[in-house]
Amino acid sequence: MAEKAMNKEFEELFQKLIARPLGMKSSHFTPVNTDGGHAPMLGGGLCTTLHDYMRFLDMIYHNGVFEEKQILKPETIHEMQADQVGNAEVHPGEYVERALKKYHTGIYGLGEWRELIDEATGEAYQISSPGWAGAYPWINKQDRVYGFFIAHVQGSSQKEDGFSSFYGSPVISQTVSNIISLKR
Protein backbone atom coordinates (compact mmCIF):
# COMPACT_ATOMS: atom_id res chain seq x y z
CA MET A 1 0.00 0.00 0.00
CA ALA A 2 2.82 2.41 0.86
CA GLU A 3 4.50 1.71 -2.47
CA LYS A 4 1.28 2.46 -4.37
CA ALA A 5 0.48 5.59 -2.34
CA MET A 6 3.98 7.06 -2.66
CA ASN A 7 4.93 5.53 -6.04
CA LYS A 8 8.26 4.40 -4.59
CA GLU A 9 9.85 1.06 -3.67
CA PHE A 10 9.48 -0.08 -0.06
CA GLU A 11 13.22 -0.04 0.66
CA GLU A 12 13.49 3.55 -0.58
CA LEU A 13 10.58 4.57 1.67
CA PHE A 14 12.05 2.73 4.65
CA GLN A 15 15.43 4.41 4.20
CA LYS A 16 13.98 7.91 3.68
CA LEU A 17 11.24 7.88 6.34
CA ILE A 18 12.61 5.59 9.06
CA ALA A 19 16.23 4.44 8.73
CA ARG A 20 17.98 7.72 7.87
CA PRO A 21 16.05 9.90 10.35
CA LEU A 22 16.86 7.36 13.09
CA GLY A 23 20.50 6.98 12.04
CA MET A 24 19.96 3.28 11.28
CA LYS A 25 23.02 3.06 9.01
CA SER A 26 23.26 -0.73 8.97
CA SER A 27 19.61 -1.61 8.31
CA HIS A 28 17.84 -2.74 5.17
CA PHE A 29 15.24 -5.28 4.07
CA THR A 30 16.29 -8.36 2.13
CA PRO A 31 14.25 -9.38 -0.90
CA VAL A 32 12.17 -12.55 -0.83
CA ASN A 33 14.45 -13.89 -3.55
CA THR A 34 17.93 -12.48 -4.10
CA ASP A 35 17.89 -13.12 -7.88
CA GLY A 36 16.77 -9.52 -8.36
CA GLY A 37 13.46 -7.84 -9.10
CA HIS A 38 11.73 -9.28 -6.02
CA ALA A 39 9.86 -7.43 -3.30
CA PRO A 40 11.44 -7.12 0.15
CA MET A 41 10.53 -9.72 2.73
CA LEU A 42 8.75 -7.55 5.32
CA GLY A 43 8.15 -10.38 7.80
CA GLY A 44 11.58 -11.46 9.01
CA GLY A 45 13.52 -9.72 6.26
CA LEU A 46 15.05 -6.82 8.20
CA CYS A 47 18.84 -7.02 8.32
CA THR A 48 19.94 -4.77 11.16
CA THR A 49 22.16 -4.40 14.20
CA LEU A 50 21.23 -4.21 17.86
CA HIS A 51 22.35 -0.56 17.87
CA ASP A 52 20.09 0.32 14.94
CA TYR A 53 17.08 -1.59 16.23
CA MET A 54 17.33 0.01 19.67
CA ARG A 55 16.99 3.39 17.95
CA PHE A 56 13.76 2.16 16.38
CA LEU A 57 12.46 0.85 19.73
CA ASP A 58 13.42 4.13 21.42
CA MET A 59 11.35 6.04 18.85
CA ILE A 60 8.33 3.74 19.30
CA TYR A 61 8.63 3.95 23.11
CA HIS A 62 8.73 7.75 22.95
CA ASN A 63 5.55 8.00 20.88
CA GLY A 64 7.29 8.55 17.54
CA VAL A 65 9.99 10.96 18.80
CA PHE A 66 13.71 10.25 18.53
CA GLU A 67 16.35 12.71 19.76
CA GLU A 68 13.72 15.48 19.97
CA LYS A 69 12.63 14.90 16.36
CA GLN A 70 9.14 13.60 15.45
CA ILE A 71 9.71 10.62 13.12
CA LEU A 72 6.22 9.08 13.26
CA LYS A 73 3.07 10.86 14.36
CA PRO A 74 1.69 9.92 17.79
CA GLU A 75 -1.51 8.89 16.01
CA THR A 76 0.49 6.42 13.92
CA ILE A 77 2.04 4.85 17.02
CA HIS A 78 -1.39 4.66 18.66
CA GLU A 79 -2.87 2.95 15.59
CA MET A 80 0.04 0.48 15.45
CA GLN A 81 -0.70 -0.52 19.04
CA ALA A 82 -4.50 -0.50 18.75
CA ASP A 83 -6.51 -3.71 18.57
CA GLN A 84 -6.62 -4.53 14.86
CA VAL A 85 -8.57 -7.77 15.11
CA GLY A 86 -11.58 -6.56 17.10
CA ASN A 87 -13.88 -9.38 18.03
CA ALA A 88 -12.15 -11.92 15.80
CA GLU A 89 -12.16 -15.47 17.08
CA VAL A 90 -8.85 -16.22 18.72
CA HIS A 91 -8.21 -19.93 18.97
CA PRO A 92 -6.72 -21.41 22.14
CA GLY A 93 -2.95 -21.71 21.98
CA GLU A 94 -2.32 -18.55 19.94
CA TYR A 95 0.92 -16.67 20.69
CA VAL A 96 -0.19 -14.46 23.60
CA GLU A 97 -1.89 -17.31 25.46
CA ARG A 98 0.83 -19.86 24.75
CA ALA A 99 3.78 -17.55 25.46
CA LEU A 100 2.40 -15.49 28.33
CA LYS A 101 -0.39 -17.63 29.76
CA LYS A 102 -2.74 -14.68 29.13
CA TYR A 103 -5.90 -14.75 27.07
CA HIS A 104 -7.54 -11.81 25.35
CA THR A 105 -8.97 -11.31 21.88
CA GLY A 106 -7.17 -8.06 21.02
CA ILE A 107 -3.87 -9.79 20.41
CA TYR A 108 -2.59 -8.02 17.33
CA GLY A 109 -1.81 -4.44 16.36
CA LEU A 110 -0.05 -3.44 13.14
CA GLY A 111 3.21 -5.40 13.11
CA GLU A 112 3.05 -5.82 16.89
CA TRP A 113 1.70 -8.38 19.31
CA ARG A 114 -0.36 -6.77 22.06
CA GLU A 115 0.98 -8.99 24.81
CA LEU A 116 -0.31 -7.33 27.97
CA ILE A 117 -3.48 -5.26 28.09
CA ASP A 118 -4.80 -2.79 30.66
CA GLU A 119 -8.20 -4.32 31.34
CA ALA A 120 -9.71 -0.96 32.33
CA THR A 121 -8.75 0.87 29.11
CA GLY A 122 -8.14 -1.93 26.60
CA GLU A 123 -4.78 -0.30 25.78
CA ALA A 124 -1.75 -2.51 25.27
CA TYR A 125 1.00 -1.72 27.75
CA GLN A 126 3.38 -4.42 26.53
CA ILE A 127 3.98 -4.90 22.83
CA SER A 128 6.47 -7.07 20.99
CA SER A 129 7.40 -8.36 17.58
CA PRO A 130 9.15 -11.70 18.11
CA GLY A 131 10.83 -13.59 15.31
CA TRP A 132 10.92 -17.35 14.80
CA ALA A 133 14.73 -17.35 14.74
CA GLY A 134 15.11 -15.90 18.23
CA ALA A 135 14.74 -12.11 18.01
CA TYR A 136 12.51 -10.62 20.72
CA PRO A 137 12.06 -6.83 20.82
CA TRP A 138 9.57 -5.59 23.40
CA ILE A 139 8.27 -2.43 25.04
CA ASN A 140 6.56 -2.37 28.42
CA LYS A 141 5.05 1.08 28.95
CA GLN A 142 3.79 0.29 32.45
CA ASP A 143 7.25 -0.63 33.73
CA ARG A 144 8.91 2.01 31.52
CA VAL A 145 11.34 -0.43 29.93
CA TYR A 146 12.15 -1.73 26.48
CA GLY A 147 14.76 -4.05 25.11
CA PHE A 148 15.81 -6.48 22.45
CA PHE A 149 16.87 -10.05 23.16
CA ILE A 150 18.66 -11.79 20.32
CA ALA A 151 19.40 -15.50 20.02
CA HIS A 152 20.14 -17.18 16.73
CA VAL A 153 18.27 -20.45 16.38
CA GLN A 154 19.35 -22.86 13.65
CA GLY A 155 16.60 -24.77 11.86
CA SER A 156 13.21 -25.11 13.47
CA SER A 157 12.43 -22.81 16.37
CA GLN A 158 10.84 -25.75 18.19
CA LYS A 159 13.50 -28.01 19.70
CA GLU A 160 13.21 -31.69 20.64
CA ASP A 161 13.02 -30.81 24.34
CA GLY A 162 10.02 -28.56 23.62
CA PHE A 163 11.87 -25.23 23.92
CA SER A 164 10.92 -22.61 21.35
CA SER A 165 12.68 -19.26 21.24
CA PHE A 166 9.51 -17.76 19.77
CA TYR A 167 7.34 -18.83 22.69
CA GLY A 168 10.08 -18.69 25.33
CA SER A 169 11.36 -15.15 24.76
CA PRO A 170 8.60 -13.33 26.71
CA VAL A 171 10.02 -14.85 29.90
CA ILE A 172 12.90 -12.39 29.48
CA SER A 173 10.68 -9.31 29.42
CA GLN A 174 8.77 -10.57 32.47
CA THR A 175 12.06 -11.19 34.31
CA VAL A 176 13.30 -7.68 33.47
CA SER A 177 10.02 -6.16 34.71
CA ASN A 178 10.19 -8.20 37.92
CA ILE A 179 13.76 -7.05 38.60
CA ILE A 180 12.82 -3.42 37.95
CA SER A 181 9.85 -3.73 40.32
CA LEU A 182 12.15 -4.96 43.09
CA LYS A 183 14.52 -2.01 42.58
CA ARG A 184 11.79 0.65 42.82
Language-model region placement:
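Second-shell loop/turn segments in exported
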Residues: 1-4, 41-44, 66-67
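Extracytoplasmic/secreted envelope proteins and their assembly/folding machinery
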Residues: 11, 15, 50, 54-57, ...
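Active-site Gly/Thr loop motif
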Residues: 25-51, 82-146
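A penicillin-recognizing enzyme superfamily signal
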Residues: 70-74, 78-79, 90
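Short, well-ordered beta-strand elements
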Residues: 144-157, 161
